[in-house]
């Protein structure tokens, strides 16, 4: 993740001094070779481990990616890496929209450089966007490890399976939870403590693959400590959810969901 961040945000992280006379193609090429080697090794280990997990394979045949033979495991790992690196330009493009959203949405941001260097929300989004590509390729274990690493460092828990659009904004971020099957549109803003979660997980593994988390349409703002729960819950485009609201049913576009005003005595 550290090396990938150096590639996706060249000149911001690492010891290299990128100048007009520096060859960015050489720097990025050498770094990508190292990343590919390390990532492929980790994918091989994850696939080998999962192929031996017969109970998991029976519960979800999609988790058996390669039949378990070393040759097929290595071939599958190489295929995953090819797709992953093909996706890096798109990941970078989307991350730059996230930087723009954070800068535009936070008056305290002094510059985009400040956002890139120091905002925990951007770091959590970055890790999610990388992990999501591996998740889409049915790579076991690694996407979860990545997002939990970001969770432990930022307090922001984004499931690798969530689908999140461009210009995504998380302010402060502590306590934000975004479930695995959440769908989020473009230009969405979340504040600290927001939960986009499931109504109940009593079904356990029977609910694997079932949409359990809400859909948040474009240009929605959800303020601090609000909870939006349930796989059938849709928050319509342009809506605003007030802080500490508890929403378990769909909301039409351009709605305002607020709590009853507190009494002052």
Residue spans of the language-model regions?
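Terminal amphipathic alpha-helical/low-complexity segments used for targeting or macromolecular assembly
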Residues: 1-148
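Short, conserved active-site entrance elements at the starts or edges of catalytic domains
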Residues: 136-166
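Short coil/loop residues immediately preceding or within conserved phosphate-binding loops
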Residues: 153, 173, 211
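Glycine-rich beta-solenoid repeat tracts in large extracellular/virion proteins
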Residues: 156, 176, 227-228
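Glycine-rich phosphate-binding loop
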Residues: 170-178
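Alpha-helical transmembrane segments of helical membrane proteins, especially in multi-pass transport
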Residues: 177, 181-183, 187-189
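Glycine-rich hexapeptide-repeat left-handed beta-helix
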Residues: 186-265
